[in-house]
């Protein structure tokens, strides 16, 4: 109806991201052995159908742009380059409007701001921070961001907009606000923020300013993908003691949750010479997206500690030598089919670790060469049926709604791939329908 395009070409294997000519895949645990016992696997992950060269980003526009254009065709007034700064409340406590700062539409300032902010977004997202030359692209991005902020500082006008039927806060989360992350989720402060420049927590602050309450502010989703290359997932992931704690083939958000929430943010992939050789070969598979190849090679070359024996590796990294030896022997036995794996890992996804030298790759929250992408889950508490923001007594604040990452939502306890679009569409429609029903 709105011209957002999807495609049925499917990628059936485990992967952090499908090849660029596949648009339906498994962004979850459905292919993991222990999960397959509970439910038949189904590829539920849809990428928007758009040809984007070799880039794995920028696909959201294929969904957003048609929805935006449809809304504009229906009469929506869109205020570009406008920031909400304050809510207006009447004597009964109802939210009736918002104070905004706007760069005048069509002005020279607006033209320059649009150009600068687009360039800032391009360069800031160009390379993961650990990759060579990332400091250069990030520096260029910050240069353009400062130019855009300078225009904001002198070129904006104050306006008040009346909200006759309701006001919806949907400004994203707060992962790009270091102070908020440090306050609410300090264990993830060294992760790599995964969001847009707008994820500053502004909507949460606005809601709190009129009595809105928050929840789950310390809940963070962390994404630790180690496949590709499959050789890493075929090896073992251990904690600071040298113990396994998970099936290594689980979805990246599941592995990241285990590491960040249950292992003190510290974990390593331990693999042997055979796995290292296989990983180099797999990194050059033409089916990989460039960022998968580059990150794999970077970590194979720079992110490892190496030793001739398991015991020497344990001493070098700081594992308990006896624990690491027992972990590897138990894993090798399960990989050979001599005993079941305690984490129900599929034997087809296991390779014995027998050929020295042995390697340990840091996949912790603070890993230097393998940054851990993180997003925020917490936000304003809302009434489930309507999306109205709740106050300290658990009562709805009249006229004030919240949606998306600004609010606590269906997926605020655990990551579900695609939650940003899916939850925004669902929670936005819920608020709109409640407003429409109230005015019938």
What are these model-predicted stretches?
Residues 161-173:
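Short hydrophobic core segments
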Residues 179-204, 407-439:
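A conserved FAD-binding loop/helix module that cradles the flavin
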Residues 72, 172, 208-211, 436, ...:
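Hydrophobic/aromatic-lined pockets within catalytic cores
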Residues 176:
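Glycine-/small-residue-rich beta-strand-loop submotif within the FAD-binding core of flavoenzymes
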Residues 1-157, 165, 179-181, 196-200, ...:
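Mobile, glycine/GP-rich and aromatic-enriched active-site lid/loop segments adjacent to catalytic centers
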């Amino acid at each position: 109806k709105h011209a957002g395009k999807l495609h049925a070409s499917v990628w059936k294997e485990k992967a952090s991201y499908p090849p660029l000519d596949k648009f339906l895949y498994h962004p979850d645990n459905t292919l993991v052995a222990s999960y397959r016992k509970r439910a038949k696997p189904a590829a539920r992950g849809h990428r928007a159908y758009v040809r984007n060269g070799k880039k794995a980003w920028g696909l959201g526009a294929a969904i957003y742009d048609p929805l935006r254009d449809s809304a504009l065709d229906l009469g929506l007034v869109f205020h570009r380059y406008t920031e909400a700064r304050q809510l207006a409340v009447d004597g009964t406590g109802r939210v009736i409007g918002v104070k905004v700062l706007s760069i005048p539409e069509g002005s020279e300032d607006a033209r320059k701001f649009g150009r600068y902010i687009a360039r800032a977004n391009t360069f800031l997202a160009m390379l993961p921070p650990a990759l060579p030359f990332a400091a250069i692209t990030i520096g260029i991005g910050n240069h353009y961001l400062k130019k855009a902020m300078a225009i904001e500082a002198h070129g904006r006008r104050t306006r008040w907009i009346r909200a006759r039927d309701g006001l919806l806060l949907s400004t994203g989360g707060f992962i790009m606000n270091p102070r908020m992350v440090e306050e609410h989720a300090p264990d993830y402060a060294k992760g790599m923020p995964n969001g847009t420049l707008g994820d500053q927590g502004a909507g949460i602050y606005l809601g709190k300013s009129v009595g809105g309450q928050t929840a789950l502010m310390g809940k963070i989703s962390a994404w630790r993908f180690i496949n590709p290359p499959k050789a890493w997932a075929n090896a073992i992931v251990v904690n600071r003691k040298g113990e396994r704690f998970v099936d290594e083939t689980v979805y990246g958000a599941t592995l990241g949750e285990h590491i960040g929430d249950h292992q003190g943010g510290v974990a390593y992939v331990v693999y042997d010479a055979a796995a290292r050789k296989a990983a180099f070969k797999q990194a050059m598979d033409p089916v990989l997206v460039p960022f998968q190849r580059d990150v794999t090679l970077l970590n194979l070359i720079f992110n490892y500690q190496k030793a001739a024996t398991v015991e020497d590796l344990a001493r070098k990294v700081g594992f308990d030598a006896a624990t690491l030896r027992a972990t590897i022997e138990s894993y090798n036995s399960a990989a050979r089919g001599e005993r079941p794996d305690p984490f129900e890992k599929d034997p087809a996804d296991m390779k014995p670790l027998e050929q020295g030298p042995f390697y340990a790759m840091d996949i912790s929250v603070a890993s230097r060469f393998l940054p851990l992408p993180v997003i925020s889950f917490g936000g304003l508490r809302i009434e489930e049926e309507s999306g109205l923001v709740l106050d300290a007594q658990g009562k709805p604040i009249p006229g004030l709604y919240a949606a998306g990452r600004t609010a606590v939502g269906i997926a605020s306890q655990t990551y579900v791939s695609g939650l940003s679009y899916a939850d925004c569409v669902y929670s936005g429609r819920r608020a709109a329908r409640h407003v429409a029903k109230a005015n019938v």
